[in-house]
Amino acid sequence: MLLFDLSGFTVTIFYCLLSAAVAATAYNALRVKSYSQAFNFRSHFHFDIMSYIGALGFFIDFVNRCVGIYNSIESTEYQSRLYFIVQCVACTAAFLSSLYLVAVGISFNDLNYDFRQLKVFRFMPLLWSIALILLVMQDAVSFESNVDEILKQILLVCGVCFFYRFASETLAQDNESAGRATVLFGRLYSYIAAVYFIDRLMLLFSQKTAVSDFDGIFSVSALLICTFVFFFERNIVANEN
């Protein structure tokens, strides 16, 4: 069943299942007392490739937002100057985040290069996530009739939490254990992004949205980014102490 079509009691069931899944994920992530360091470059998952996939996700979002900004200017329908500015910030942050993840991938290929020296870039994914939350907060949504939008907001909150932790990990000392919150929010972001993508894909197949739908393209971006996030978390667990 599409999240778009949920109503009444089925909405309650969905939120109960979502809460249970979040609780189970939190328990599983937090019960481990200590993880390995976040950036152990002995990757078990071709993490350089996963970083490039994540970079592609950010770049797709950058292009998607550029097109959206252009269309808004052409039609003079953008909501406000503040909305336009935040969209530009999100667009810029998406592009710089794409470059940043390329640098992450290079670091896992070339041990003589360390992306952690890019001190300003480490905050770009976090800035992107915050900008997206500011954008969605400008639209009123209902917990009962806008389940897919609520899921998107939860995804963005998890994104802020994860990329804050990711930036924090780049400041950690060598051999310092990765934070349990990093693993937790990495898993939550990955799982919710996958569910959100499936929902948008089902909307497309049911012909309730177009291929060029803004949120549909964003779901593709989120899926590619969550590929990077998921294998980042998996790499920490694989090297667990």
Regions found by a protein language model. Name each.
Residues 1, 12-24, 150-241:
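C-terminal transmembrane-bundle signature of multipass membrane proteins
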Residues 1, 63-76, 133-145, 198-208:
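Juxtamembrane "helix-exit" motif on the non-cytosolic side of transmembrane helices
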Residues 1-90:
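N-terminal topogenic module of multi-pass integral membrane proteins
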Residues 4-15, 79-92, 115-124, 137-158, ...:
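Transmembrane alpha-helix entry/boundary detector in multi-pass membrane proteins
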Residues 20-36, 98-108, 160-169:
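Canonical alpha-helical transmembrane segments
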Residues 34-46, 106-120, 170-180:
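Membrane-interface helix-boundary motifs at transmembrane edges
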Residues 48-65, 87-103, 119-136, 153-164, ...:
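Alpha-helical transmembrane segments of multi-pass integral membrane proteins
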Residues 93-110, 228-239:
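Alpha-helical transmembrane segments and their immediate juxtamembrane interface regions
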